[in-house]
Regions:
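Glycan-recognition and catalytic cores of secretory/periplasmic carbohydrate-active enzymes
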Residues: 1-134
Length: 134
């Protein structure tokens, strides 16, 4: 099962990571055709939360340094673009270039207090497990 999870993660991250601006694009076409969705080239907070969780989970379970690299690459992107260092919380929606959409949104019908706290709690638990092994 872990091999399948690794393959799915690797395929998704390589297909969706924006090599020009960083971050994960919200939609990419599996066949390389132009996406039909309006928000296809936006970066949303929750897929980045999922990258942080899944890359750390894979690293915890396999020791694969590439997964740890993806964790830190994604964390760096999130800290630079999603996180608001002045007023806290994360912006929910970024343009492709990494700037918040306008008006900027930290909470809405679709962005509530679930994904980010869940991500942080799961990361804390996994890092505690890794520290206990060391």
């Amino acid at each position: 099962l872990i091999e399948k999870a690794q393959t799915i993660f690797d395929n998704a991250i390589h297909a969706g990571w924006d090599e020009e601006y960083g971050g994960l694009l919200y939609f990419v076409d599996a066949k390389g055709l132009p996406p039909e969705s309006y928000e296809h080239d936006m970066k949303l907070w929750w897929p980045h939360n999922e990258i942080l969780i899944s890359s750390m989970m894979l690293y915890r379970d396999t020791g694969n340094e590439q997964d740890l690299d993806w964790f830190f690459k994604t964390l760096d992107y999130c800290q630079k673009h999603f996180s608001d260092p002045v007023y806290g919380e994360w912006y929910g929606y970024l343009r492709r270039d990494g700037l918040p959409t306008m008006p900027s949104t930290k909470g809405s019908t679709f962005k509530g207090p679930f994904h980010l706290p869940r991500c942080l709690m799961q990361l804390d638990q996994m890092m505690t497990e890794l520290e206990a092994r060391a």
